[in-house]
Amino acid sequence: MLSGLVTALRTLTLFPVPGKETDTFSRSLFWFPVVGLLLGSIQAALGYFTSLLGWNELSAAFVVLGGIALTRGMHADGLADLADGFWGGRTRESALRIMKDPNVGSFGAIALSGMMLLKWIAILKLVDIGAFACIAAGVLLARWVQVLLASALPYARREGGTAQSFVSGAGVVHIVVTSALTLLFLFPLLHADLYANLYAVVAMISAALAAALLTGLLSYRKIGGVTGDVLGAGSEVTELFVWIAAALSAALKA
């Protein structure tokens, strides 16, 4: 079972995990919330300790850039590829072809820049009020959404691809188990946060589901399923939606 954790860490992070390569791709999905909690905790800690410098704008920037660094920029790259393909390709085939191009086009650059700016704004609000647990929760929920997308939609590329091994083995059991794990981690995590009341928790979970629905429907309509880029983009969109929901909830509470 731990081989699934190894695969999840190798896939989702830059951490050098020792051991042999395994083919436990579908089993690794069960560990996505665990890895999300780990990454989120690191980003939250990064935000907290840099905020002690008294320069919250810089702290928020460290959280955004830290998230990109911890994932080797993989999810950010997926967002850029998705934007280029979905808005630059008129047909399913052209969209998939553009998404496979390693070069970033104008749509991708705009999407990536906009995402980083909006994340920075939302995180700055959370840092200002000390809601660091909400930062971790956003990363946790984003990895859960990746499992939802992989389990609910077929793989889009007929010729196969990197993420096919994850998507082809995903199913209802992955949704059930990861949903339980996500809730198990989420409520204790946010219980310690002064600003994360029940309404905020509901708002954050709803924001994550909205991100999953938006990404899933758009991807199914455009390319008939998901790819690795779609899963990465879904993670990015979820983080943004959850952090905005948390920031708005805190503002309304205040």
From Swiss-Prot:
Keywords: Cell inner membrane, Cell membrane, Cobalamin biosynthesis, Magnesium, Membrane, Transferase, Transmembrane, Transmembrane helix
GO cellular component: plasma membrane
Topological type in the membrane: Multi-pass membrane protein
NADP recorded as keyword: no
Gene expressing this chain: cobS
Annotated organism of origin: Pelodictyon phaeoclathratiforme (strain DSM 5477 / BU-1)
Family: Belongs to the CobS family.
Subcellular location: Cell inner membrane
Function statement: Joins adenosylcobinamide-GDP and alpha-ribazole to generate adenosylcobalamin (Ado-cobalamin). Also synthesizes adenosylcobalamin 5'-phosphate from adenosylcobinamide-GDP and alpha-ribazole 5'-phosphate.
Record pathway: Cofactor biosynthesis; adenosylcobalamin biosynthesis; adenosylcobalamin from cob(II)yrinate a,c-diamide: step 7/7
Cofactor dependence: Mg(2+)
Keyword Magnesium: yes
Molecular function terms from GO: adenosylcobinamide-GDP ribazoletransferase activity; cobalamin 5'-phosphate synthase activity
Membrane spanning residue stretches: 29-49, 50-70, 98-118, 121-141, 170-190, 198-218, 230-250
Gene Ontology annotations of biological process type: cobalamin biosynthetic process
Signal peptide limits: none
Name the record gives this protein: Adenosylcobinamide-GDP ribazoletransferase
HAMAP family the UniProt entry points to: CobS (MF_00719)
EC number, UniProt record: 2.7.8.26
Catalytic reaction list: alpha-ribazole + adenosylcob(III)inamide-GDP = adenosylcob(III)alamin + GMP + H(+); alpha-ribazole 5'-phosphate + adenosylcob(III)inamide-GDP = adenosylcob(III)alamin 5'-phosphate + GMP + H(+)
